[in-house]
Amino acid sequence: MNQSYGRLVSRAAIAATAMASLLLLIKIFAWWYTGSVSILAALVDSLVDIGASLTNLLVVRYSLQPADDNHSFGHGKAESLAALAQSMFISGSALFLFLTGIQHLISPTPMTDPGVGVIVTIVALICTIILVSFQRWVVRRTQSQAVRADMLHYQSDVMMNGAILLALGLSWYGWHRADALFALGIGIYILYSALRMGYEAVQSLLDRALPDEERQEIIDIVTSWPGVSGAHDLRTRQSGPTRFIQIHLEMEDSLPLVQAHMVADQVEQAILRRFPGSDVIIHQDPCSVVPREGKRSMLS
């Protein structure tokens, strides 16, 4: 695992924690001043943000540790656990927002000064957009599942802040139930994001194969290599930033062992150039021992 990956992922986790802490302080003041249930929803979400981002920071630091005697494949699965924990945090906040929205829908409470809430929400929206942009850049560079989960969370915050702005504007003109209605909508959207995030984390923990596009690239690299007659039994998974790739190469029976080994090494290096940092295992099979009827599509 290269130092650039660790540095970028750690910075993203620290930035998210710092931003969530700043926004929490701002929203506490705004809620105290306006009494807006939508801002209360945002405040609770910021509390969850801090818990989730702190968890993310600690788990990311652990996942960056190199492989050891007890963890031969490294600690990358900790990122999936962080994403799963975040989905639980977010689901809890969504339930709270939903129940609070129902309560205020039944008994709406006028806000004292929606203007303050509008200003605070605009500030929160700008800060969150900046954070999400940075996280998206980090995800493009690292493919970190933990940072991607955090980014999805803060993307829902952008949607939420936009909805809060609209709710505050409507409440300003006397539509007091709009505040509660938007809180309900925000809660439903956050719950959807949490379920999607949890599903992706569970799939990673269950060693889901790499995407079809990446597996097809591996097949294309292998089958186009001189000296390789075919390939089968492609198996892939991902743990943190590391892709694990196993494949059997089919070679002519007459090919000397040393030459077969050299071809396998060349194929491995070609795969690593396309997917740096991967753990690649290649097995060489003589064509005569590969039952033709037993060959299956490697994408099946």
Swiss-Prot record:
Activity regulation, short description: Cytoplasmic zinc binding may trigger movements of two electrically repulsive cytoplasmic domains and reorient transmembrane helices, thereby modulating coordination geometry of the active site for zinc transport. It may modulate activity in response to cytoplasmic metal fluctuations.
Offer one example of a GO biological process linked to this entry. cadmium ion transmembrane transport
Q: Which residue ranges run through the membrane?
A: 17-30, 42-58, 82-103, 118-136, 148-158, 179-198
Q: Where does Zn(2+) 3 bind?
A: 232, 248, 285
Please describe, based on the UniProt annotation, the reported consequence of changing residue 232 to A. Shows reduced Zn(2+) transport kinetics
Report the superkingdom from the record.
Answer: Bacteria
Q: Which residues lie on this side of the membrane: Periplasmic?
A: 31-41, 104-117, 159-178
Q: Which GO terms describe its cellular component?
A: plasma membrane
Q: Which residues lie on this side of the membrane: Cytoplasmic?
A: 1-16, 59-81, 137-147, 199-300
Compartments where located:
Cell inner membrane
Positions with a binding annotation for Cd(2+): 45, 49, 153, 157
Q: Which Pfam families match?
A: Cation_efflux, ZT_dimer
Principal location class: membrane
| Other facts | Asp-49 and Asp-157 are required for both metal binding and transport process. Asp-49 is a selective binding residue for Zn(2+), Cd(2+) and Fe(2+). Asp-157 is a highly specific coordination residue for Zn(2+) and Cd(2+), but not for Hg(2+) and Fe(2+).
Q: Share the domain note from the entry.
A: The two transmembrane domains of the dimer swing out to yield a Y-shaped structure. In each protomer, the cytoplasmic domain adopts a metallochaperone-like protein fold. Each protomer contains three zinc-binding sites: a tetrahedral active Zn(2+) binding site for zinc transport, which is located toward the center of the transmembrane domain, and two cytoplasmic Zn(2+) binding sites that may serve as zinc sensors and regulate activity.
Family, as annotated = Belongs to the cation diffusion facilitator (CDF) transporter (TC 2.A.4) family. FieF subfamily.
Q: What is this protein called?
A: Cation-efflux pump FieF
Species this chain originates from: Escherichia coli (strain K12)
